[in-house]
């Protein structure tokens, strides 16, 4: 957050700054979103909602995935959170056991490693510099994986850099991960084996 505060100071002084802190867009909230918020307030939608999302919101998510991606889900498979950080924290708490590793490309949002540590895991930081447009390569991903790898963070568009992986780049990363098979007869007896990437 110190980076964000410093960027704001420099902007106030007239400097042209690209902030790599909070990851906020450089445009205002679109009017139709502002109006929807006003309508919701006028309709009295100002109380606590179900933790996992309202039925109407869950249905909108179901409809979106069906329409845009050809995927079918039920409301019991949808969990709405207040943002990406909460979702990542929830994932870590639910999936990480002691010393499980989480691969995190850097630059990353400041709290990602701490959320892994709070869950008892070990962050594995993969440096992705400006020379590679702040994107992790398949070779870097392969080198970061171990028998203890439980999660891989892939944030696109990236917060804080804004870098976006192309479809080809995502496929290449997916090929590295596709050869991994996790079996879990019990939560404490996990094994990982390699399978051909065509599997």
Name every feature range the model reports, one short phrase each.
Residues 1-83, 90:
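N-terminal small-domain helix-loop-helix segment of the aminotransferase-like
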Residues 3, 7, 112, 173:
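Aromatic/hydrophobic pocket-lining residues that form π-stacking "cages" and hydrophobic walls in ligand
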Residues 28, 88, 112, 161-162, ...:
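Glycine/Thr-rich phosphate-binding loops of Rossmann-like dinucleotide-binding domains
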Residues 193-199:
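Hydrophobic alpha-helical segments, chiefly the membrane-spanning helices
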Residues 75-76, 93-154, 164-168, 175, ...:
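PLP-dependent aminotransferase-like
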Residues 156-159:
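Flexible low-complexity scaffold tracts in large eukaryotic assembly proteins
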Residues 29, 49, 133, 161-165:
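Secondary-structure boundary/capping motif
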Residues 182-189:
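Conserved small/polar residues in nucleotide/adenosyl-binding loops
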